[in-house]
């Protein structure tokens, strides 16, 4: 098994606490409203804390698909949230698990900087596919921007 680590950063005009609330605390409600392709977010196991598994159902290529998302850690005081993709179409056959360690910090002009570390654990001696990595980054960028756009369009959300 190999572990491959990547880091990325997103900037937003939304304040860190407000963005965190939308991305973590109210995610099950906000994400399907903000991200056009996501139909639903539902808890399939757990109570919403670490260890909880959520099913995100979305439309891709005209078909309904899903990913299983496991909450690894929630750190409200430091605006941190760690989760893993543990099943569904978001996990190619060569990948054991994809983990995301996220943290929001204060950005310019009251906005946010989202810092994310992505760890891909492969099965056997498989190597991550570069195209899959680029596609995953593009989905992450689009997701983050969709949440930011939703919050900008709904300034009363807090």
UniProtKB/Swiss-Prot annotation:
Amino acids binding melatonin: 83
CDD domains, sorted: Bet_v1-like
Pfam families in alphabetical order: Bet_v_1
Organism: Lupinus luteus
Principal cellular location given in the protein's record: cytoplasm
Keywords: Allergen, Calcium, Cytoplasm, Hydrolase, Metal-binding, Nuclease, Pathogenesis-related protein, Plant defense
This protein's name: Class 10 plant pathogenesis-related protein 2B
UniProt-listed InterPro entries: Bet_v_I/MLP (IPR000916), Bet_v_I_allergen (IPR024949), Plant_def-hormone_signal (IPR050279), START-like_dom_sf (IPR023393)
EC nos: 3.1.27.-
Chain sites annotated for binding Ca(2+): 32, 35, 38
């Amino acid at each position: 098994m190999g572990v491959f680590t990547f880091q990325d950063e997103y900037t937003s005009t939304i304040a860190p606490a407000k963005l965190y609330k939308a991305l973590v605390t109210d995610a099950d409600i906000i994400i399907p409203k903000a991200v056009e392709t996501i139909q639903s977010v539902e808890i399939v196991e757990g109570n919403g804390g670490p260890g909880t598994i959520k099913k995100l159902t979305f439309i891709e290529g005209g078909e309904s698909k899903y990913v299983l998302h496991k909450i690894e850690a929630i750190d409200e005081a430091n605006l941190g949230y760690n989760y893993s993709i543990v099943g569904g179409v978001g996990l190619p056959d060569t990948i054991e698990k994809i983990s995301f360690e996220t943290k929001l910090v204060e950005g310019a002009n009251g906005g946010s900087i989202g810092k994310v570390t992505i760890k891909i654990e492969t099965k056997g001696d498989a190597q991550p596919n570069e195209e899959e990595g680029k596609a995953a980054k593009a989905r992450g960028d689009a997701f983050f921007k969709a949440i930011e756009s939703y919050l900008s369009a709904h300034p009363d959300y807090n």
